[in-house]
Curated annotation (Swiss-Prot):
Protein encoded by which gene: Trmo
Protein name: tRNA (adenine(37)-N6)-methyltransferase
Chain intervals for the UniProt region annotation (Disordered): 196-242
Segments of skewed composition (Basic and acidic residues): 207-242
Family: Belongs to the tRNA methyltransferase O family.
Length: 431
């Protein structure tokens, strides 16, 4: 017992010798809150990121052995547009992992595992930002997923732009300080009030293809001019709004301003931002002339106070400018006819389980193939081989050329073509 007490936060040992869960030591036994039902039945063809295919759908049902009333745990979640899904990469095939990996996006180049989203990690845990379609009882319906069917889900968390986005986080942390600094003669500046009134209604700008949508769209043209001006201020992008705040605080700095006129807001804000650089201004109740030592000191003080701002997130160039370029996707006439048959509306014909129409299924297939789902090995050594994957009830056969992918056949998943060689050559189809 004394030995265990001296160990402090070390894991406690059971009589069998196994390590018992201990939160303080970081040892815990996770239990899935549910298992995902996804339109992707296998790893092959599943998007590597949730932003690739917005039409992919899934359903998560909370297990009753987690909560007696699963619907109680989801109360209030329907008010959010997007959610974080924490899950387990349960189809890794092995538990081995390396410090350096070769992500397909780098096309063979190596980088550290913690700088990637590789599933082969010390703890095989994944994170996905998915769109919340609806909450029904104890089930959550999602779209824009990159998880396969049967994925164990560990947790659900709401996406909150003010907390999860570096852009909005900067405005959130500084807004009370900026508001206090913009006060003149004890009264808050009108432009400051107008700008801050829109905080919390703007979703951050995303570098990926898909963006979390604003919960409130722009107001229509039939509203009054004042309402339109207020709406424009509220829906200004975070970085533009932060720039407007900066200009409101130091209007005499001779920096160029490329903000569109329709984003400047009401007349009082426009006139404030359009003040000439040769006009005196008030700083903390005192009149300051341009070029004076007082102005220089105030500018230096302002830059020091705002030096820790992070107006946007930064990613390496291989994320935004990957060596693997997007592919053009095309369908043969026979493949398009097969796709229409899968959703013909005839009771005797099979239909999709997740997609709402054949056109939606086609767009999903295009999104998957445009991102080139092949591994680096297949890209380099199997260029003349067919590629197969399944999405929803459609088993897709395609081949890849120079800068394009062509779908040549689509069959019902239960009737997929069986071939002796899984890497059948293109000549087998007579193409």
């Amino acid at each position: 017992m004394r030995g265990l007490e001296k160990q402090g936060s070390c894991a406690t040992a059971a009589p069998c010798g196994c390590v018992q869960p201990a939160l303080e030591a970081g040892n815990l036994l996770t239990e899935p809150i549910g298992y995902l039902e996804s339109c992707f039945p296998a790893k092959i063809g599943t998007p590597r990121q949730p932003s690739i295919c917005s039409h992919s759908r899934a359903c998560l049902k909370i297990r009753k052995n987690i909560f007696n009333n699963p619907e109680h745990s989801l109360m209030g979640l329907e008010e959010f547009s997007h959610v974080w899904i924490l899950f387990v990469f349960h189809k890794n095939g092995h538990l081995n992992y390396k410090a350096k990996v070769q992500p397909p996006r780098l096309n063979g180049a190596k980088t550290g595992v913690f700088s990637t989203r590789s599933p082969h990690r010390p703890n095989a845990i994944g994170l996905t930002l998915a769109k919340l379609e609806k909450v029904e009882g104890g089930a959550v319906y999602l779209s824009g997923v990159d998880m396969i069917d049967g994925t164990p889900v560990l947790d659900i968390k709401p996406y909150i732009a003010d907390y999860d986005s570096p852009q909005n986080l900067s405005v959130h942390n500084d807004h009370h300080k900026l508001r206090a600094e913009a006060q003149v003669d004890g009264t808050a500046n009108s432009c400051d009030q107008l700008l801050l009134s829109g905080r919390g209604k703007v979703q951050p700008r995303q570098s990926t293809k898909e963006r979390p949508k604003c919960l409130e769209d722009r107001t229509s043209g039939e509203n009054s001019q004042k309402s339109r001006d207020m709406s424009e201020i509220q829906h200004t992008l975070p970085e533009d709004r932060e720039r407007a705040l900066d200009l409101a605080l130091e209007p005499s700095r001779g920096e160029s301003m490329d903000m569109p006129e329709n984003q400047l807001g009401p007349p009082e804000l426009k006139s404030f931002l359009e003040e000439g650089t040769d006009r005196p201004r008030k700083v903390e109740g005192a009149l300051v002339l341009p070029g004076s030592s007082a102005e220089t000191q105030w500018d230096a003080s302002y830059r020091a106070r705002t030096a820790d701002r992070v107006p946007y997130s930064v990613v390496p160039s291989w994320v935004t400018e990957a060596p693997v370029a997007p592919l053009q996707v095309r369908f043969t006439p026979h493949a398009e006819m097969d796709l229409r048959k899968l959703n013909s509306g005839d009771a005797s014909q099979p239909s999709f389980k997740y997609f709402h129409s054949a056109e939606e299924a086609k767009r999903a297939i295009e999104a998957v193939l445009s991102a080139d789902p092949r591994s680096v090995y297949r890209r380099k050594l199997c260029e003349d081989r067919l590629f197969f994957f399944t999405v929803d009830t459609a088993h897709v056969t395609c081949w890849f050329g120079d800068g394009f992918a062509e779908v040549v056949r689509i069959k019902l998943a239960s009737e997929s073509v069986q071939v002796a060689d899984p890497e059948e050559s293109l000549a087998a189809l007579g193409s």
